[in-house]
């Protein structure tokens, strides 16, 4: 049986898989493809959108999208997430979905506005993204205090 292999890039969500593997003491390999490589057809066979991260599992199957990678790791290694079937796991799943479907997209709109609007609309787009994030961060702070940021 092989090892896990993370295909990553700084700032692209691959750090989360590294944190989880280190927490449970799992050895893994990691590579950082250059921008030209992620545009090639063979990389798109891993992820049709050409995005990073991708997790290549020991048996060879591949997983893309950070939330799916987190779900794989937390279900295969004990102690990383609450037990399935418990109210605490439901809450955990809710926060994971919130991060993946609301917080990260708002962050991306704020910092990568060129994907979503013409330059003339950047300021408005960014302001809306910041406002959306503020509501979400206030919610998380209320729900998870004192566990994050004191």
Summary of predicted features, one role per range:
Residues 2-125:
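GST-like domain detector, emphasizing the conserved glutathione-binding G-site
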Residues 79, 142-150:
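Surface-exposed helix-capping loop/turn segments at secondary-structure junctions
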Residues 125-144:
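Amphipathic alpha-helical packing segments from all-alpha helical-bundle domains
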């Amino acid at each position: 049986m092989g090892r896990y292999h993370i295909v990553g890039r700084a700032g692209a969500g691959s750090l989360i898989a590294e944190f989880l593997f280190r927490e449970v003491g799992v050895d893994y390999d990691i590579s950082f493809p250059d921008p030209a490589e992620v545009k090639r057809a063979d990389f798109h066979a891993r992820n049709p959108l050409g995005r990073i991260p991708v997790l290549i599992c020991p048996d060879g199957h591949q997983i893309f999208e950070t939330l799916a990678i987190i779900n794989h790791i937390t279900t295969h290694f004990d102690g990383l997430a609450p037990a399935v079937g418990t109210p605490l796991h439901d809450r955990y799943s809710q926060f994971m979905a919130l991060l993946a479907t609301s917080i990260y997209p708002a962050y991306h709109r704020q910092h990568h506005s060129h994907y979503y609007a013409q330059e003339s609309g950047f300021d408005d787009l960014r302001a809306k993204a910041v406002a959306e994030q503020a509501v979400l961060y206030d919610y998380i702070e209320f729900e998870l205090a004192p566990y994050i940021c004191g």
